[in-house]
Amino acid sequence: MTTLPPLPMTRPKLTALARQKLPCSSRKIPRSQLIKEKDDIDHYLEVNFKGLSKEEVAAYRNSYKKNICVDMLRDGYHKSFTELFALMERWDALREAARVRSLFWLQKPLEEQPDKLDYLYHYLTRAEDAERKESFEDVHNNLYALACYFNNSEDKWVRNHFYERCFKIAQLIKIDCGKKEAEAHMHMGLLYEEDGQLLEAAEHYEAFHQLTQGRIWKDETGRSLNLLACESLLRTYRLLSDKMLENKEYKQAIKILIKASEIAKEGSDKKMEAEASYYLGLAHLAAEEYETALTVLDTYCKISTDLDDDLSLGRGYEAIAKVLQSQGEMTEAIKYLKKFVKIARNNFQSLDLVRASTMLGDIYNEKGYYNKASECFQQAFDTTVELMSMPLMDETKVHYGIAKAHQMMLTVNNYIESADLTSLNYLLSWKESRGNIEPDPVTEEFRGSTVEAVSQNSERLEELSRFPGDQKNET
């Protein structure tokens, strides 16, 4: 394509007159006269600016987009011109639609982006040349270069267009044992996954996985294509299973996650295998298959321990605690939650600490261990204050308030049951101040022993009175 320096701004008389009469002028001039004057200008420029042909003058006068299109047609690249023109039309349509939706949409028209036009011209024409020679690998490489160039948030639809072209061409390439086809399936899977079409994405990722089995192919960064296929399939299967679990399709979700687990083992990546086990365990928990869930989650914890991955191990303890809680095994659930709290604290995982403390507090509160519940909820609340998270702060504050109320409840009940003047005075004093209610300091044996036991060991008394079965088990 010819590019010329700007012409001098000093204009001869003919040029100055012509600028006033060209179509951009507001005057109404007959078309025949304009054509004649245009020819006169071309002749004048050809005579007075030596070395400028009529085509070069036209190249200077026309827009960059028009020059690109003219060059394509003049050089015989009719397919490239057709594809470029269709892309420009769609570009303008999308730009107009976006402009209507948002007043602040700032993407430039394609004709105002010469770098992109240059890329399109260069690689489309080279791809067309290669197609004429039936060199399909070169066709694919040129189209793939365009897909990579347009891999950004604004131009993603252009990238997807060239991914689709690459996919069609890759199926014609036979000399690489299917590597290009495998990569094309990977890109098509990504295209559908980003669009939320998970079933279509899974189909392409399955084909990608099948084509890479037993191969040592690597991508541009040196990563194994088979490992990438396993990761892509696991990610898609997990997203599919999430939707199935939302719809309470537990059997289908478990089935697809078992398949994901098998693929993860094939990939020989322990981290990936652990992730598959974790989500499979959660699916069994949702389906109320508790024993199976415990078995699978135990496998996850063992792999996490082997990998020395504390954060994953903490997540496993949390999941196991949920299963045990669902089974009514509160004592065992508390053990795992304490481990989860310890890991979260040691690794400065504040959100995990809030979640673990809240779960632990809920169990203590349910069992009537109000002092311990209050301590757990206070820990959760203090952590949310450090995080400056208002929604979490409000939630933990409610839990903490309920636990404190339960903690005070036993002392208040004992004052009421005593039914004497001193107890009444304490209750009235507390009602006025609404502070922490103090135990009765009266030294009588029956009152002192009762209040002291309530204030210092309320959770132990509750265990004796309300959960005799648990006490027997402990002894």
From Swiss-Prot:
Pfam families: TPR_12, TPR_16. The keyword Cytoplasm applies. The keyword Cytoplasm applies. InterPro entries: Bac_ResReg_Asp_Phosphatase, TPR-like_helical_dom_sf, TPR_rpt. Residues 437-475 are annotated as: Disordered. One of its GO terms (cellular component) is cytoskeleton. Residues 459-475 have a biased composition (Basic and acidic residues). Expressed in spermatozoa (at protein level). Keywords: Cell projection, Cilium, Cytoplasm, Cytoskeleton, Disease variant, Flagellum, Repeat, TPR repeat. TPR repeats lie at residues 92-131, 136-173, 182-215, 234-267, 274-307, 314-347, 354-387. It is found in: Cytoplasm, Cytoskeleton, Flagellum axoneme. GO terms for biological process: cilium movement; cilium organization. Gene3D superfamilies: Tetratricopeptide repeat domain. The TPR repeats are required for axonemal localization and flagellar beating. Axonemal protein which is implicated in axonemal and/or peri-axonemal structure assembly and regulates flagellum assembly and beating and therefore sperm motility. It is linked to Spermatogenic failure 42: An autosomal recessive infertility disorder characterized by almost immotile spermatozoa due to multiple morphologic abnormalities of the flagella, including short, absent, coiled, and bent flagella. Some spermatozoa also show abnormalities of the head, acrosome, midpiece, or endpiece. This is Tetratricopeptide repeat protein 29. It comes from Homo sapiens (Human). The lineage of its organism: Eukaryota, Metazoa, Chordata, Craniata, Vertebrata.
